[in-house]
Amino acid sequence: MADEAEQAGLRILGDVLSAAHSAGDLSCLSPDLLARIADTFHLQRVSLFQVHEAEGRGIAATCVIDWRRPGLAFPAMTEGSHPPLTAAGGDPLLAQWAARRRRGETIIGRTRDLTGYLYGFFSHYGVVTFLTEPVMVHGRWWGHFCVDTPDAEHEWTAVERQAFKCIAAVLAGLLARSGTEGLVSEAARRAMLDTSIDAVIVADEAGAIVEFNHAAEAIFGHTREGVIGRPMTETIIPAHYIDRHRQGFMRHLATGENHIMRRLVEVEALRADGSVFPAELTVNEHRAGGRRLFSAFVRDISDRITSRRALERLAFTDMHTGLSNRTGLLRLCTGRPTRPSGAVVLMLRDLGVVKTSFGDDWAEPMIVETANLLSRMLPQEACLGRTGESEFTVVTWQPGAAAELAETLIGRLRSAIESGGRRFYLRVGLGVVERPGDATYLLRDAEMAARDCRDGHLLHFAEHMRAQHQQRLELEMALRDVIQRRTSALSLHYQPVVSARTGGLVGFEALVRWYSETHGPVSPALFVPLAEAGGFAERLGAWVIETAISACAGWNVRRRAHGLAPWHIAINLSATEVVAPDLIERVRQTMAFHGLPPQCVCFELTESAILNQPEIAIETLSRLRALGCTTAIDDFGTGYSSLSYLQRLPMDVLKIDRSFVLDMVDNSRSREIVRVMIEMAHGLGMSVVAEGVETTGALQILRQMGCDRAQGFLFGRAMPGDVAGTLPETLAPTG
C-alpha cells in the first residue's frame, strides 16, 4: 500500500510539473488538476493564499486559488476580513504562524487543537485536519499552499508532506520566473520584517549584515543603521563562536555542506552591551540579483533556558542540601566514561522521630551537617547524593574507596555532630558494596546492607541478603493475601494478665499469630513491620480489634451467667492505626455490636508509635478514653522515653518492658529502675503492669513495690481463645 501511495504521489507531481511547464504561471493549477491532487491524497480542499500589505495596517492574506468538495464554503479572505499582523497586537497564534512561515516551516495540525481567531475561521469553513506549506520566492514568504482532509485522526505521511513541499516549490519557481513576486511590495516586505516576533537578520556571502528588523534591534540592542554593512562577527556573534562560525560558513560557500541550514538550533548570541544570551536560530539561503543571501531568524530563549535549568534543579537536586537527589546521582554516574567500583549508603535511623517530635528546626540542621560532613570526607572522583528522606549515598570509582570511607565514617559518627550550637548523636546504619557495576544495582545492594546492619555499625553487602529480601517480599505478599482473604492462617492468642497482689486473673492481652503454609510460624516481630511497610497494617489491626472484642464479649457472657466479674482485653495499636481517621467509629461500632462495655477494652501503644505523629496520637487516645476505654503505654523504657510527653499523654496504664523485669532479681540497677517507674506512674495517676514476670522472686519484688498487675510465663503463655476461656479465677505461679 505504501508503494502504491508513493507511485500515485509521483504521478500527480509529474502532472503538476507538466502543467507548470505548459502554462508558465499559476493558471497551471486548473480545477481538473486540483481535483486530481485532492483525489490522490483524499483531500477535501486545496487552496493557495497570497500575503500582502493591508492598507498600512500589517500583513493580510487573500485566497487566490481554491478547489473544494461540494458543500464547503469559499474562504473569501479580503484585506478587511483577515486580521492584519501588526507589531502592536493581533492574534498571537496567527502571528506565531506568520513567523514560522517566514522561516519556511511547514505547519500541520487539527482545528480542534487551535485557539482564538484561527479556531473560529477554520471551524467556519469546515477545516478538520490541515497542512500548509509556505511558498518561498527568493527566500521570502510569498504565500502558502494549503490542503485539508475531513479525517480528524489523519496523520500526514512522509510521501504526502514531500509531495506538497514539491508543489509549493514548483509554484515558487513559477512566481520567480514570471515576476509575480513583485505583487508583494517593498512596503509589504518591510511590514513582514517589522511585524515578525523573531529577530530577522540578513547577511551576504561576505558575512556583512544587509537587513536588521525591529525585533533584532530590541533583542540585540543595536540600531539598524549601526549594523548595516558590518560583519556579523563584530556585532552579534560571541568571541568563542567566531572561529566555528567562520569555518562552517566557508565550508558551506565552498561545498554546500551545512549542519544548521533550515534547521532549528540553539546557539549563543552577543548583545550590544557585551552580554551573551541563549538563542534559537533558523537560517535559510536565497539568491537576489546574483547575490547569495542568508536570512537568520533569531529568538531570545533566556526565559526558556532559565525555566529549563530550574526544572532540572527540581528534578535532579535535593533542595535542602544542594546535593544530587537519587535521579540526579544516577544521572551523574551514567555520564561517566567508566563504571563505578563501589557505593556506601548512610541511613539516619532517628530522623523521622526527630522531625515529628522536635520539628524541622532540629531535623534540618542534622541533615545539612551530615551532608557537609560527607562532602568533606568525599574520596577523589566520588559522587555524593541525598537519595532518600533519611539516606545519603556515595558512589566511588577507586577500588577500596567505599570500604575505607565507611570505616572512617562509622568512627566519626560515634562522636557528636555540632550545628547551630546544637549537638547531635546520630543512630545510623552503613551499607557497603565493593565491586564494579552499574550504579543502580550498587545503590540497591548498599541500601539492603544499610537496612540490615545494626545501629552504629557497617555491613558489607553479601549475596545471601538478596535472598533474604526476596523472602521478605514473599512473606509480605503472602501476608497481604492472608489478610485480604481472612484465612485461618491468622489467629489471635491471649496471654493472661493477673493481679500482682492476689494472682487473680483480670484479663488478657491479644497477640496476633500467623502460621504460613510455606514458611511455618512467622514471628509478629517480623510480619507486623511488614504489614506497616506494605500499607495494610490498618486492615490487619481492624481484624484484630474485631476478633479480640468478639472473644472477650463471649467470655464475659458466660462469666456473667455465673456471677463472675468481667475480664478485660488489651489490644495493641500500630503507628498506622493510631492515625486512621475511622478508628474511633470502628471501635465504637464493634463494641456496640458485640455488647462489650468500653471499660473492658484497653488499647496499648508503644512510645515509638506515639512519637511518629504525637499530636494525632494524643488526640486519638483522648477520644478512646472519651468512649470509656482505657489506654496504656507499652514497653515503657525501651523507646524514646520523654517525661514531658508522658505528662501530656492521656494514659491510664504504664506497662514496664520485660527487659527490666527479667533482670530485676539479680540486678539492683534494674530493680531500682522498676521501682522508680512504678512510683512515677502512680504519681501520675496511672496503674502499672509488669511484663516478663517469669519467677516467683520477681513477682514477690513487684508486690513489695506496689505493682498493680503482672503478665508473663509465670502465669501462662499466649493461648488460643477457647483455652483462655477455661482458665481458673486465680493463676498459681507455674514456674
UniProtKB/Swiss-Prot annotation:
It comes from Azorhizobium caulinodans (strain ATCC 43989 / DSM 5975 / JCM 20966 / LMG 6465 / NBRC 14845 / NCIMB 13405 / ORS 571). This is Uncharacterized protein AZC_3085. Residues 185-255 form the PAS domain. Residues 472-732 form the EAL domain. GO terms for biological process: regulation of DNA-templated transcription. SUPFAM superfamilies: EAL domain-like (SSF141868), GAF domain-like (SSF55781), Nucleotide cyclase (SSF55073), PYP-like sensor domain (PAS domain) (SSF55785). PANTHER family: BIOFILM ARCHITECTURE MAINTENANCE PROTEIN MBAA, DIGUANYLATE CYCLASE DGCP. Residues 25-175 form the GAF domain.
